[in-house]
Amino acid sequence: MTRYISTRGEAPELGFCDVMLTGLARDGGLYVPAIWPQLSADTIAGFFGRPYWEVAVDVIRPFAGGEIADAELGRMANEAYATFRHPAVVPLRQMSPHQFVLELFHGPTLAFKDVAMQLISRLMDHVLAKRGQRTTIVVATSGDTGGAAVEAFAGLENVDLIVLFPHGRISEVQRRMMTTTGAANVHALAIEGTFDDCQALVKAMFNNHRFRDATSLSGVNSINWARIVAQVVYYFTSAVAAGAPARAVDFVVPTGNFGDIFAGYVAKRMGLPVRTLRIAANVNDILARTLKTGIYEVREVHATASPSMDIQISSNFERLLFEAGRHDAAGVRRLMESLKQSGRFVLPDATLAAIREEFDAGRADETETAAAIRAAWREAGELVDPHTAVALAVADRDTTDTTVPSIVLSTAHPAKFPDAVEAACGQRPQLPAWLDGLMTKSEHMKVMKNDQGEVERFVLSVSRAAKQGVAG
């Protein structure tokens, strides 16, 4: 069995299935594997040209540690990626001799979150059914995670899903993907606050152990290790398509909660030859500032055209602190306590140096983001969403070394942000025909104050696990 440990060192070690159902560790930390599995260069090279779901099985298998049979994992991966509307699942497009764009938006809700969510919903339902358990999933979303979770978990017998999103701070398409499902096990809550407020509510509920146990609480934000593992796969498939492992590659990743780019770090730890992981931030640039100064300091969140990155508390950064700090859990606890008390912490010199060896960072403001949307349309005839545009703007600043392929992650379909795209380049992206009815369906949502007690009471009222007393 693969063992998982908490970044804060005070929670029990767990196996893969328990980590997936647990989400946040009971000490407030995040789970990571005690030892990183390795893939040989021959194994990685062998991924070339294989179906995406087969590569997913080979990448995920060592993390599952024998807890899920290969045949079951293969069946669920095949089903999950059959929901995507491109034969390659996540196609890699060449934009210039050395720059590629990895399209992660061909899933049911047009965002990269579908890649992990379509698989994790099947994995969770499979494990719950085998154990005869139900769970209550509470998820915070800055826009895309919620829609992907609703699509993936709607109608499942063993799961109740409650989605928290910042009221008035996401696009209409994003909101409607959460509010129009009609499934009895799905509940959308518009919280009067920011995404960071929503995420803080979810963490507070996990840290209320009596409530957590009563509802059999679980989470599918990227605090959940299974989400990260599922995203590792496309780093391998895209890098191999661009020439790895015979040559190294760079990745440029639109970054908010640090989950997607951390999956790239995991791929590198497993043996993928990645030269640089570049964080692309909008004006909410806490991670870019941290890499520059060594000080992680929360500032006011500014609403932008790339709302999924309008974040100041990047949860998955804690996983990197733990790894870069050589598994110093006490050190992580000190940093997180400082963040909680003062809204800032100073990175130890050795930790900062270790992070800078693997990552660099850039930011793009609203003007630069709009210019990148215009440039993609003018030069390549491509409409790109604002998050992808941030990454393109950051990538295009460093074009001195053209020997290493640069892969920009395109995380959402432009039609999820039609107003921003049209304002930038004059072209309005259209939703795919199969989503025609989305904008006219009736919505079901509840506006709620940023109040932990009020949210917990609502969750208790809809949780079948709580009502049946089956929390385990």
Predicted features, each with a name:
Residues 1-472:
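PLP-dependent amino-acid enzyme catalytic core
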